[in-house]
């Protein structure tokens, strides 16, 4: 029998700042803020990140080729405003839009070496590690795949330790699984265990007592063209009050790059999606007593918690969250049994659907999707579940290669429903992409080929070790693994896109024939895609969770566009789209920084109109 629970949402305010913090004079007339950015030597600086914050809302734009920047209309009031670019010190000021609507900046170059390193996003930190010898390149790949399964490289490598210190860190990290659970005395990450000594020596050579060492600071071009026309609106989500964290005088939340990549302690959001009214919903992934999911009012920044009760007064936490084509918000809920939940944004009614005994529960790194028939799909440890919203009934489809094979870590990661009602999923640890045909009831699977260049780097000792190796969790891959993570369907074109997190590529599947090809990311060695989402124009959006960027791929031109995110250490997992009235919003959660963000891209005409308005006296 299907068990269904209906739960009322929690309406109590969330302590420690989840309640509304309004920008000053939020009801006053909107104002235009603009200015120019130049270097200390007087040169105009294009592509500089310029942010303005009031209350819990931060708006970010980028300067154009002439060094000028133009914000969209902002509520009149007082703002903190800052400008930053890699290798330059952050410039800060305050502006009252009731009195002034222009703020110019002069950026001075950073002269302190460690301050330059601290600014870097994860891909540039990784790029700076030595690769002068085959052994260097071999160890660099092990760092990339096995030291970044739960955090960006910049979180650890912004610091320096001697060989003893790096040994102690690796000793600890090899006992923590991908979910952040310490397994002291239990099973360890065998890859880190095997390579521990040489990894510690390698890291100490790069980020050790000697300033600079073998580490090479690299930067990247600042945004131009379409990427420089992006506008970000970020909403702060207060840290988990259960952890009783002290309020710092200068919070490190990734907003000021000079302070480095933040700690993730207390951050709640994981996935995020907009409802049809433009408000933002996010899954709360960290154990807490207040919320399972939260809703952000996009106009005010107010956060409202919705709680599903679990044991001992805790909230049933979530991981995956989507909006279906009817506007309903679906998410998984970890209660006594991994379940599916829905909230109607209009009525705020929450419903919970528990899989019947005998079926797999919805657990693991859960991803959700819906298909062309409106059925909801969710990942399990053994495959996928389909939920029929009309009949309120579950069906199960299991992986051909069971999760117990090859070390027992073959649970489902990505899930996508195609236009014909079929489902596709990935087993990340096994490099498998699977499909269930609903009409025939048959399943099939594809094993992705290894990353050949990485196999060539392995020495004889490595080869001998890996011959008997089986991953201990999804975060302990072979150095040559592809790591198919989350996936997305272009239902109109009949194309599945797979984000290969370790392989630095997208896989393209024809959903009718199963034919597959690869599309490499612009820099496969450092770019790690997490998800793939397709817009109405067939563009593929993939968050690169260690680079603080989101990439757009246009299959018609084979062109990539990289959009810089305004926060350092975002660890963005998924992009959700809202396409209405000719306007596209790209919604992302920043799990490490405890924010939810909306990106829009202005047209050249939009920007020209703002320039004209700003020039008026």
Report residues per predicted region.
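The canonical Cys-X-X-Cys-His
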Residues: 143-154, 199
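Short Pro-Gly-centered beta-turn/loop motif in secreted/extracellular proteins
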Residues: 43-46, 70-78, 86
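Short, acidic Ser/Thr/Gly-rich low-complexity loop/linker segments typical of extracellular
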Residues: 55-68
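Beta-rich, blade/repeat-based domains predominating
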Residues: 244-246, 263-276, 312-325, 358-373, ...
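Blade-level signature of beta-propeller repeat domains, shared across WD40, Kelch, NHL, RCC1
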Residues: 566, 570-617
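Structural motif
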Residues: 34-45
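Conserved beta-strand positions in repeat-built beta-propeller and related beta-rich domains
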Residues: 274-275, 280-287, 329-336, 376-381, ...
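A short, solvent-exposed loop/turn motif at the edges and junctions
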Residues: 55-56, 78, 82-94
